[in-house]
Amino acid sequence: MSNVTHQPKIGFVSLGCPKNLVDSERILTELRTEGYDVVPTYDNADMVIVNTCGFIDSAVQESLEAIGEALKENGKVIVTGCLGAKEDQIREVHPKVLEITGPHSYEQVLEHVHHYSPKPKHNPFLSLVPEQGVKLTPRHYAYLKISEGCNHRCTFCIIPSMRGDLVSRPIGEVLAEAKRLADAGVKELLVISQDTSAYGVDVKHRTGFHNGMPVKTSMVSLCEELAKLGIWVRLHYVYPYPHVDDVIPLMAEGKILPYLDIPLQHASPRILKLMKRPGSADRQLARIKQWREICPDLTLRSTFIVGFPGETEEDFQMLLDFLKEARLDRVGCFKYSPVEGATANELADQVPEEVKEERWNRFMQLQQQISAERLQEKVGREILVLVDEVDEEGAIGRSMADAPEIDGAVYLNGETRVKPGDVVRVKVEHADEYDLWGTRV
C-alpha cells in the first residue's frame, strides 16, 4: 500500500530578471523534493506563489496584476521576490494575499507553503527531481547565480534596498552546482548576480575548496575553474572594475566566451557623477581598445539610460560620441523613469518625456547603424552556433556573441537535421541590425 496521500498542487508565476528566475528554480526544486506537484494552471492548484519584480514602475504594475489574476483565479496566494520588500504597497492593492516575503527568502516561502498546505507524506525519491534541480530554462543552458545583493548605491536603482549588500556564495558551492549542470547536459552557463565582478569582495576573496583543491573566491578564479568544464561560459552584469581586464586573456585563449556584458549607463562625466557611477568615458574607450587588441573577437554588450535628471543636449551628445567611438556590439537603452525609493527622484531638472523619447530614438537609430555594420563584418565568416529551436522550417540558434532573450539570433533556414543543444559550424550569408542568417558547414 502506498504511503502517498493527497499530493498538494502549487501554481507558480516567475516574473523579472534571470536572477529572479534562479530564485524561482530553487523554490520549485525544494517543493518538488518535498513531494509537492507544480502545476501550470491556477484553477486546480491548492495555492499560487508569485515571485515578483519591483525594479521599475512597469515591473511593479506587472507584478501587482499577476497577483490580482492569481487571487481572482485561485484565491490563495503567497507573494515573494523584490516587490515583496514593499509589503504595505502590496497589501494596499491586494489585502487578501496570504503571506508576503522579500527576495531570496526561500525558507520563509516554504514555511508558509507548509502552513497552508502541509507537506505530503511521500517517499523522498530524489531521483524524481533532476540532479540539476528544477530548471525554467531550456535543458541546454542555465543561469548560475554567484552572489546576492550589491554594495553600490547608484541613484537610479533600488536593488540594494530590496536585496541588501553583496553576499557571495561559497565558491565550492558555485562550482559544484556548475559541475552538476554540465553533467546534466547543459552546454552554456550564464554567470549572473547584481554585480558579477565584485564576487568575493565581501569575504575578502578568501580561499574556498572544490574537489579538495584551494580556489580563491574571485571572478577571475571562478572563470578559470568554469573553463575546465568544457562548455560555454558567459559573463553578465560586470561592473567595470580594473580587474575586469584580467578576464580578457581567458577569453582570447578560448577558455570562456569572448563576451562581456558591462553596463556603462552614460558617457557624460557630470551625469555619471549624478548617477554615482564610475566616470571617465576616455578611460573606458582606452580599455575597450586594449581589450579588442588582446581579444579581437570580443563582443561587448552594454546598457545606457537617456533622459536622466539634469541631462542636457551637450551631455546627450557626449553619449552619442561615445557610441560612435566605442562601436559596441549589443546595446540596450532605457528612458529614465522614476522608481519609488530611488534618490535620483530628488534631483533637479527632470527631463520632459517628449525629450526623453526624442533622445531615445536618436540613440537607437545610431546604435542600429553601428550594430548593422558590426554584423555585416561577419558575412562570409564561419562561426559556431548553439541551436535553441528546431521546427519544420529550420533551426534558430545563437552565436558566441548572443545571450538568450536579450541579443540576436542566427537563422538556419531549412536546417532540420539538428536538435536543441547541438553546437554546429555555420557560414554566415546575410545580416541585418540584430540577426544573422547562414548555412551549416
Swiss-Prot record:
Disulfide bonds: none annotated. Keywords: 4Fe-4S, Cytoplasm, Iron, Iron-sulfur, Metal-binding, S-adenosyl-L-methionine, Transferase. One of its GO terms (biological process) is tRNA modification. GO terms for molecular function: 4 iron, 4 sulfur cluster binding; aspartic acid methylthiotransferase activity; metal ion binding; protein methylthiotransferase activity. Its EC number is 2.8.4.4. Catalyzes the methylthiolation of an aspartic acid residue of ribosomal protein uS12. PANTHER family: RIBOSOMAL PROTEIN S12 METHYLTHIOTRANSFERASE RIMO, RIBOSOMAL PROTEIN US12 METHYLTHIOTRANSFERASE RIMO. This is Ribosomal protein uS12 methylthiotransferase RimO. The lineage of its organism: Bacteria, Pseudomonadati, Pseudomonadota, Gammaproteobacteria, Enterobacterales. The gene is rimO.
